[in-house]
Amino acid sequence: MERNDRKVLMTLLSVNIDHVATIREARRTNEPDPVAAAAICEMAGAHGITVHLRGDRRHIQHRDVKILRETIKTKLNIEMAATDEMIGIALDVIPDQVTLVPELPGEITTTGGLDCTRNQQAITNAIKRLQSNNIGVSLFVDPSEQQIRASLGLGARTIEINTARYSDATLTNHPTKEGAEALEDVRQAAEFAHSKNMQVLAGHGLTYRNVGAIAKIPHIVELNIGHNIISRAALVGLERAVLDMLAVLQ
């Protein structure tokens, strides 16, 4: 999808529902069910649902992705490491898209983008196996021309630009030099990837307050946002939280 007329076409929103499962797993119970949360997000207008199936199963479970595949009406994007176990699960579930991400034991959240200049064989094999089963593949990368070139060389046609540095620099409403520089890095990365005929997504740490500038960047067609939406949902409800984010993106 190419957005030549920004007044007509808005940036798409994929809602990451991991932290609905985080609440459930805090008590090792059945509620809240991320499957129900996904349905609410879709009914509120979300264009897709994202989940991260981690090796340690700290929140999303195999059961969740199997049921989500049967119930989601929009687009199911599963974030995962490029391991044999995870790729096997993806080939069983057949999501619309897999986003390959780095994964470190004990990390609170994903700490950076894939290093596409290393572990190339594992990433390439994962991409080939997924694409041969008609599963779209995106690589989560830092806003670096080197990483984008490397991802293209590995066979990727879609990237998700890591917005963590921008997000960390824009936690308040006060403009900062670091925030402006990080925003420009994302803009340049999106422009470069687009020039290579790649589809460009973005996400990580985005909030209602800082997402507007990212959504205005040409060629970024979709944003993956989770924690801030789920945090707001705890106060105003999930439907309202999704509607509020969609309003910002418009």
Role assignments for model-derived ranges:
Residues 58-84, 118-138, 178-202, 245-249:
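Alpha-helix-loop-beta-strand connector modules within alpha/beta enzyme cores
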Residues 100-107, 158-171, 219-238:
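Glycine-rich phosphate-binding active-site loops on the catalytic face of alpha/beta enzymes
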Residues 11-17, 49-51, 76-78, 98-100, ...:
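Hydrophobic faces of well-ordered beta-strands that scaffold small-molecule active sites
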Residues 136-192:
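Histidine/lysine/aspartate-rich catalytic loop segments that bind and position anionic ligands
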Residues 69, 172-179, 231-250:
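C-terminal helical cap(s) of enzyme catalytic domains, especially alpha/beta-barrels
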